A protein has these predicted regions:
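N-terminal positively charged helical leader segments and presequences
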Residues: 2-46, 133, 139
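RNA substrate-binding interface of SAM-dependent RNA methyltransferases
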Residues: 5-10, 56, 64-148
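Short, hydrophobic beta-strand segments that form beta-sheet elements in well-ordered domains
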Residues: 12-18, 33-35, 56-57, 124-125, ...
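Short, polar loop motifs at secondary-structure junctions
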Residues: 17-22, 59-60, 129-130, 145-147, ...
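Short loop/helix-cap segments at secondary-structure boundaries that form the rim of catalytic
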Residues: 23-29, 62-66, 134-135, 154, ...
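Active-site/ligand-binding-proximal alpha/beta "capping" segment
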Residues: 142-172
């Protein structure tokens, strides 16, 4: 919840198993707090041992016009892969992640767990990649075998986009 405060996420509803054992600061961030039982928590979490609290958040709105270092994701299917890409992008200082329609939902539970909260630190949007690339003011690098060049041989850029393709089909 400390990250929530820094990221500006608005918690609309908070669901907790034991409200009396939940930190008051966390409850203060939520517009509404509800008590749920363990059976409901297990159903919501999809895991054997739920964490004890769940939140409904307002989907963030981002100003993406100033993004200089962008990860473009072309239909990544596996939620664990997407979460890992989000977490790695956050650690690497990427400004924006743009996903093509057909990419896994960044707010799905498995993606959220794999991203370790990074989905709330970095703007993640869905857009038509061809349109985004046409409007982007910088080089776009892709992952492909044809005419491949080692990344260490490419001059460093302040503004760039990196395109990663689908697990089975690559970049379209």
């Amino acid at each position: 919840y400390k990250r929530q405060d820094q990221s500006g996420i608005v918690i609309k509803q908070l669901f907790v198993i034991e409200p009396n054992r939940t930190d008051e600061a966390l409850k203060d961030y939520a517009e509404e707090t509800f008590e749920i039982n363990m059976k409901v928590a297990e159903s919501l979490s999809g895991t054997i041992t739920p964490q004890g609290f769940f939140a409904v958040i307002e989907k963030p709105k981002y100003d993406v016009t100033q993004a200089k270092q962008v990860l473009l994701i072309d239909r990544i299917q596996d939620p664990g892969n997407l979460g890992t890409l989000i977490r790695t992008s956050d650690a690497a200082g990427i400004d924006l992640i743009v996903m093509e329609k057909g990419t896994a939902d960044p707010y799905q539970d498995k993606v959220l767990r794999a991203s370790q909260g990074s989905v709330f630190h970095i703007p993640v949007i869905t857009a038509d990649l061809k349109t985004f690339i046409a409007d982007f003011n910088g080089p776009v690098y892709g992952t492909a075998l044809e005419n491949a060049q080692p990344y260490k041989e490419i001059a460093s850029q302040d503004i760039f986009a990196l395109l990663l393709g689908n697990e089975g089909e690559g970049c379209l």
